[in-house]
Design a protein with these regions (language model features):
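Catalytic core of pol beta-like nucleotidyltransferases
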Residues: 1-30, 38-44, 54-100
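Conserved histidines in hydrophobic membrane contexts and catalytic metal-binding motifs
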Residues: 33
């Protein structure tokens, strides 16, 4: 049985519920969703692309990724948004991301 397709609204609802916890535990100042979920093109095989604004800390980002993967029951990519990042990815995030 394929995993359920999670809608953008479902993802954002969970992120809203977890926002204070995520800000405190992971030092995240902003969190949102982008990619296929934000475009309404997610399939059962799609991962969830999450964008965060936070200080560079690979350990905290890895822990956040693990927590969200467990919460959503599917692979999650956590991308740290910053001024000096891949310009194509930055443009995609700028166009697609919806934040809580």
């Amino acid at each position: 049985m394929s995993p359920k397709i999670l809608s953008e609204d479902e993802i954002l609802s969970v992120l809203r519920l977890l926002k204070e916890h995520i800000q405190t535990r992971y030092k995240v100042t902003r969190i949102g969703v982008f990619g296929s979920v934000a475009r309404g093109e997610a399939s059962p095989e799609s991962d969830v692309d999450i964008v965060v604004e936070m200080e560079p800390n690979l350990f905290l980002r890895a822990d956040l990724k693990a927590e969200l993967t467990a919460r959503f029951g599917r692979p999650v990519d956590v991308i740290r948004y910053r001024q000096e990042m891949n310009s194509r990815l930055k443009s995609q995030i700028d166009m697609e991301a919806h934040y809580v």
